[in-house]
């Protein structure tokens, strides 16, 4: 007998009177004095469980059905009928209930039917996907991921799988995880006493990637429009709700493009994926709006219908200095903006997303194109109401002389980037791109504040469980 996903029932793909078989887990069991049990069954295909009405006449009713608790897995067959109860359109009049797996000790089951704190569920990350909260997060994350790929496919982009193991620091910040097979208790040394990485697996120092951008640029300079979507790693000893040591990045790169092109692409992308999640995951978004963040839906709707405002960094500094608000972190030209500054600009001053452009070169990465003023680079951040920065990008420096000068100014050995410099030697073109931290996007969409709660198994300082 074919199995039916619960979402297909709720989408009215089966007429009343059809015999259906569903497989899933028990959310709750309720018994009536009339000798009937009501099982709320979910299978993860949608937010709402379906109710199965189980009569006492079933052969295994007393010894199995009445022992079902939250988390038990079952297969239920029965007739699909209209539900007389409020809040549900359909239910199943069960003719067969097969128990596939009992919860061995319901009293110690970590994800029992009672409500648990986010912190508690984080300690049981291997089981938390069984809850309403994390099931909804997972489906929204999946929807956003699918929409992201669709957006770039429709725009003619090629998806590039960039390496996870790399010998280059794309950010120049040095906060990287080293990859090595050397014996830590017997490290080889060279003549100067330093560790001899020539004896290591790759014959050189290697790290987990902090960004696929530099690799993506090589393909953009051949295929014109590419993007990466994969895991990245930062060895930042940060314990905030906005940082992870392992997270996913979306990084498009476009050739024959400038900063304005990258900014427009970022705006179009955000509107596309927000519209997709509002349309395709209405049930999950309704849950987030009710239980997590009452603005979850209206925030996205407003962004989809808004024009993103372009603003120069220099103008933003002047606005912040003259707004009359006292900030925790002082504002001055040449300093990087803090979240409080970004949110003021997007939420108070503009009331819509802001694309902040043309930052001082001294606070930005080596690969960003120097502007004509010699003081700023063609960089941008997309600031969204409710979170601040959500995207960072730039036009890339396509001139080899200018790039080498930046390497020298920042004390970076340009020979380590010889392959990257080759792009400027052989048919260089203006090109631009940006990076989006995917978990930060999921957090923004769902209203879930801690970024550790929008990825299946969070990796953070002192935490690499499961």
UniProtKB/Swiss-Prot annotation:
Catalytic activity: tRNA(Asn) + L-asparagine + ATP = L-asparaginyl-tRNA(Asn) + AMP + diphosphate + H(+)
Gene: asnS
Subunit structure: Homodimer.
The name this protein goes by in its record: Asparagine--tRNA ligase
EC top class, as a word: ligase
Gene3D superfamilies xrefs: Bira Bifunctional Protein, Domain 2 (3.30.930.10), Nucleic acid-binding proteins (2.40.50.140)
Family: Belongs to the class-II aminoacyl-tRNA synthetase family.
Compartments where located: Cytoplasm
Keywords for the protein's UniProt record, in alphabetical order: Aminoacyl-tRNA synthetase, ATP-binding, Cytoplasm, Ligase, Nucleotide-binding, Protein biosynthesis
Keyword Protein biosynthesis part of the UniProt annotation: yes
Pfam families referenced in this protein's UniProt entry, alphabetically: tRNA-synt_2, tRNA_anti-codon
EC number: 6.1.1.22
Source species: Psychromonas ingrahamii (strain DSM 17664 / CCUG 51855 / 37)
Classification lineage: Bacteria, Pseudomonadati, Pseudomonadota, Gammaproteobacteria, Alteromonadales
GO annotation terms (biological process): asparaginyl-tRNA aminoacylation
Cellular component terms per the entry's GO annotation: cytoplasm
Primary subcellular site in the record, as a coarse category: cytoplasm
Molecular function terms, GO-annotated: asparagine-tRNA ligase activity; ATP binding; nucleic acid binding
SUPFAM superfamilies per the UniProt record, alphabetical: Class II aaRS and biotin synthetases, Nucleic acid-binding proteins
């Amino acid at each position: 007998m074919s199995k039916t996903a619960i979402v297909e029932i709720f989408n009215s793909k089966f007429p009343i009177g059809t015999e259906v078989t569903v497989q899933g887990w028990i959310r709750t069991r309720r018994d009536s004095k009339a000798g009937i049990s009501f099982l709320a069954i979910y299978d993860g295909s949608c937010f709402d469980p379906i109710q199965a009405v189980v009569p006492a006449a079933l052969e295994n009713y007393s010894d199995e059905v009445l022992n079902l608790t939250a988390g038990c897995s079952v297969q239920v067959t029965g007739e699909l009928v209209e539900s007389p109860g409020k809040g549900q359109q359909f239910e199943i009049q069960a003719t067969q209930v097969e128990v596939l797996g009992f919860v061995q000790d319901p009293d110690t089951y970590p994800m029992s039917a009672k409500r648990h704190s986010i912190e508690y569920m984080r300690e049981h990350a291997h089981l938390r996907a069984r809850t309403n909260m994390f099931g909804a997060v997972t489906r929204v994350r999946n929807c956003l991921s699918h929409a992201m790929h669709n957006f770039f496919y429709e725009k003619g982009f090629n998806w590039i799988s960039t390496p996870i193991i790399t010998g280059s620091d794309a950010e120049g910040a040095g906060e990287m995880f080293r990859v090595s097979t050397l014996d830590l208790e017997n490290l080889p040394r060279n003549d100067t006493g330093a560790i001899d990485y020539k004896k290591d697996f790759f014959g050189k120092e290697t790290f987990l990637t902090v960004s696929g951008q530099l690799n993506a640029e090589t393909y953009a300079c051949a295929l014109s429009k590419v993007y990466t979507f994969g895991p990245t790693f930062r060895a930042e000893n940060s314990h905030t709700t906005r940082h992870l040591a392992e997270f996913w990045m979306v990084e498009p790169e476009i050739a024959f493009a400038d900063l304005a092109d990258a900014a427009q692409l970022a705006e179009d992308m955000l509107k596309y994926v927000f519209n997709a999640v509002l349309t395709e995951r209405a049930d999950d978004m309704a849950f987030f709006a009710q239980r997590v963040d009452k603005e979850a839906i209206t925030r996205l709707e407003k962004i989809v219908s808004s024009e993103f405002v372009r603003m120069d960094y220099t103008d933003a500094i002047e606005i912040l200095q003259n707004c009359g608000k006292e900030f925790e972190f002082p504002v001055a030209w040449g300093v990087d903006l803090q979240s409080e500054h970004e949110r003021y600009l997007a939420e108070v001053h503009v009331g819509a997303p802001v694309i902040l452009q043309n930052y001082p070169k001294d606070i930005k990465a080596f690969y960003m194109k120097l502007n004509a003023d010699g003081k700023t680079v063609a960089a941008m951040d997309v600031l969204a109401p409710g979170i601040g920065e959500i995207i960072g990008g730039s036009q890339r420096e396509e001139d080899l002389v200018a790039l080498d000068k930046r390497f020298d100014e920042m004390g970076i050995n340009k020979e380590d980037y010889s392959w990257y410099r080759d792009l400027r030697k052989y048919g260089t073109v203006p090109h631009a791109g940006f990076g989006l931290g995917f978990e930060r996007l999921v957090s923004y969409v769902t209203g879930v504040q801690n970024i550790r709660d929008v990825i299946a198994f969070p990796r953070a300082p002192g935490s690499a469980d499961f």
